[in-house]
C-alpha cells in the first residue's frame, strides 16, 4: 500500500468490497478504549499461519474468516465480549454503516447500499488492517484473547499461553494496556508538543513519528558522545532511514 496514503490519514480504498476504510483518529479510538481496540485487531487479524503445523490439522478445511465467524457467533460470555470488541472496532472503520453479524458474513448497511465482509474478500481486508494499524509491530503484552467456541477457544488459548510465557519472562504479564497513551505522553514531552495535538493522529502516524523520534534521539546521543571524545561506541542507524520496509 502507498505509504503517503497511510501517512495522510485519508480513507483507504477497499475495492474488493466496494467501500473505503476510515483511518480512525486516536480520539476516536479513545471512545472504545485501547483494550477493546487491540482485542478487535487481534481477532480480525487472526490467521492459521500463527499456529504450529500440528495445531492446523483440525482447521485445514476452514478459512480464517470462518474461524472468526465461529467466534463472533458463540453465545458464551467470552464470545460475546469478543464480538463486542470486534463490533466497536468495525464501527470506527466504517462509521457511515450499521454493522450486522450473520452466520456467513458481516454486513455493512446504510440507507443507500450494503456491502459484505466475507471469505472472498477477508484476506484483503486483513492486509489493509495490518498496514494501517502496524499490527506487525505489536508487543506480546498489548492485548488479551477472549475466545468463544470450542475450536476458536483452543486456538486462542494456545496463543495466549505462549504469549504469557514470553510476558512473564519480561516481568510484564500483568501490565495494563496503555500503548497509545504512553507513546503520546513520551512524544508530548520529548518534542515539546501539546498532548491534545496527538489525538488527531492515526495509529500509523503515531507509530511513524514515535519510531522516527526514537531514531533521532539515538542519533543525537551518539553524536554528542563522539564529540565528547567517547571511544568504541556502537554505531546507530541513520535516523532518516526507511522505517516502513
Give short role names for the model-derived ranges.
Residues 81-163:
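Long amphipathic alpha-helical segments with strong coiled-coil/leucine-zipper propensity
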Amino acid at each position: 500500500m502507498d505509504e503517503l496514503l497511510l501517512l495522510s490519514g485519508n480513507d483507504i480504498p477497499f475495492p474488493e468490497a466496494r467501500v473505503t476504510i476510515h483511518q480512525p483518529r486516536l480520539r476516536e479510538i479513545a471512545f472504545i478504549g485501547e483494550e477493546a481496540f487491540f482485542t478487535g485487531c487481534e481477532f480480525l487479524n487472526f490467521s492459521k499461519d500463527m499456529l504450529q503445523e500440528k495445531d492446523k490439522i483440525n482447521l485445514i478445511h476452514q478459512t480464517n474468516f470462518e474461524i472468526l465467524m465461529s467466534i463472533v457467533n458463540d453465545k458464551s460470555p467470552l464470545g460475546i465480549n469478543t464480538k463486542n470488541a470486534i463490533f466497536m472496532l468495525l464501527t470506527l472503520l466504517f462509521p457511515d454503516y450499521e454493522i450486522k453479524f450473520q452466520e456467513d458474513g458481516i454486513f455493512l448497511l446504510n440507507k443507500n447500499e450494503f456491502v459484505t465482509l466475507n471469505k472472498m474478500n477477508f484476506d484483503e481486508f486483513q492486509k489493509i488492517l495490518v498496514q494501517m494499524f502496524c499490527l506487525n509491530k505489536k508487543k506480546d503484552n498489548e492485548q488479551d484473547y477472549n475466545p468463544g467456541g470450542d475450536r476458536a477457544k483452543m486456538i486462542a488459548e494456545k496463543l495466549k499461553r505462549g504469549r504469557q510465557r514470553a510476558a512473564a519472562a519480561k516481568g510484564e504479564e500483568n501490565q495494563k494496556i496503555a500503548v497509545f497513551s504512553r507513546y503520546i505522553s513520551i512524544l508530548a514531552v520529548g518534542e515539546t508538543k501539546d498532548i491534545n495535538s496527538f489525538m488527531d493522529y492515526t495509529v500509523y502516524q503515531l507509530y511513524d513519528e514515535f519510531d522516527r523520534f526514537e531514531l533521532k534521539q539515538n542519533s543525537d546521543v551518539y553524536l554528542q558522545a563522539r564529540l565528547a571524545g567517547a571511544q568504541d561506541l556502537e554505531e546507530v542507524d541513520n535516523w532518516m532511514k526507511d522505517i516502513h520496509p
